[in-house]
Amino acid sequence: MLFLLSPAKKLDYDTPVHVEHHTQPLFVEQSAALIKVLKTLSADDVAALMSLSPALAELNVARYAAWSRKFTQHNARQAVLAFNGDVYEGLQAGSLSPARLDWAQEHVAILSGLYGVLRPLDLMQPYRLEMGTRLATPKGKNLYEFWGSTIADYLNERLAGQKTPIVVNLASEEYFKSVDLKVLKARVVQCVFQDWKNGAWKVISFHAKRARGLMARYAIEHKVAKPEGLQKFDSEGYAFDASASSADKLVFRRKA
C-alpha cells in the first residue's frame, strides 16, 4: 500500500536535519528539462505565471539558476524534511525516528511538479513549481502533459508484486490529477476530512491539509498495511464516520 502526499510551497532548509540517510531523486532528467525551460523566464515572467510577488519571483529565478543535476547534502535535503506547509506541520517528520522514516521511504510518495515523485528521503533542491502551473514545454501546454503517464507507471512499478495494490490518496486534487488513472493498476482509496461548520459538514482546506499530514504520520507510526487499519485514526479530534464512508472513500469528521 502506498500513501500519496502533495508537496508544500513553504520550505525549510534551515532547521538541522536529524537523519543522515538520504537517496537520490528518481527523475533528474525530467527535472533538468523543466529547469531548462524555467531558466528562460525572467522574474516578471515567473511572477505572472505563478502569481508571485516580485521578491518571491526573484528568489525562484535564483533557485532555477543555482539548480544542479548533482544533489548533495550541501545543496539539497531530504524532501520530507524540506517541505514545511500545513500537511507537513501535521506530519512532523522532524520528530519521526530514523526507523520510522525508513518505513515511510517504502510506503509514502510525494507528488511534485518539478520532481514528479519524491520518496521521503530523496534529496531535493529548493524550488517553486506547482503541478497546476501552465508551463509550456516541448511535451505540451502544462505539467500534466509533461509528466504524462510517468507518475502512474512509477506507482505501478512500486506496487508490482503486491497481491492487492492499493494507493491511499492524501494528495490534493491538483496533484492527484498528475496520476493517469487509465494507466494506474491499483485500487484508489480516498481519505476525506470534514469539520462541522455553520450547521453542516465541510472540507475546510487548512484543516484538511493538516489532517492529511496527521493521517500520514498515523500510518507511519502504526505501519498500516490495509485501508481498514486507517479507520482507528483519531488525531486532533477526528473520528471515522462509517455511515458517510464507502470501501474506497474513508470519511473522518470532527466537531470543534
Swiss-Prot record:
Signal peptide: none annotated. GO terms for biological process: response to hydroperoxide. It holds the Pfam family H2O2_YaaD. GO terms for cellular component: cytosol. Belongs to the UPF0246 family. HAMAP family: UPF0246 (MF_00652). This is UPF0246 protein Bpet1601. It comes from Bordetella petrii (strain ATCC BAA-461 / DSM 12804 / CCUG 43448).
